[in-house]
């Protein structure tokens, strides 16, 4: 995510949306292509999601989003569909880190999650730490510079690759005795 402004339509769901409905377990070890993983996103919760989602769209949910098993595809299926961010009242810790480590912005903002309605236009201003929707503007706690670096790089793997490449191309520092 290099864009500091995310704009899209809200896809709103409830509390305790677990990883089994984000990405069905039956595909966990059988699919590896991005397009195949994307096609099965939320199919048991919202069969219209994968065909209808557009780049920049935002998932909005209640409490404990991403609970359940540690399934990386629960985050990557959203990334592969172009989801710009997930806004929730709260996240399962394991999903939260999986999302960030895969370049998916996960925002804890209970007021926005409650105010946003399904299908409405949503704007996430990352630089201002604000969510805007028809009901108004809602502030969220900023992510640390390190975490934002990971998200902006497109995930932890890309972040580490970039850091290693930068270190490899940096001029050698003289050794001091």
Where are these regions (language model features)?
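N-terminal, positively charged, Ser/Thr/Ala/Gly-biased leader segments
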Residues: 1-26, 31, 158-177
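Acidic, glycine-rich flexible loop/linker segments
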Residues: 102-177
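Conserved phosphate/anionic-ligand binding catalytic regions in large, soluble enzymes, centered on
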Residues: 17, 66-72, 151-160
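Exposed boundary/loop context
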Residues: 1, 7, 18, 55, ...
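Feature captures the catalytic cores and cofactor-binding loops of soluble hydro-lyases/lyases
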Residues: 12, 23-25, 29-128, 145
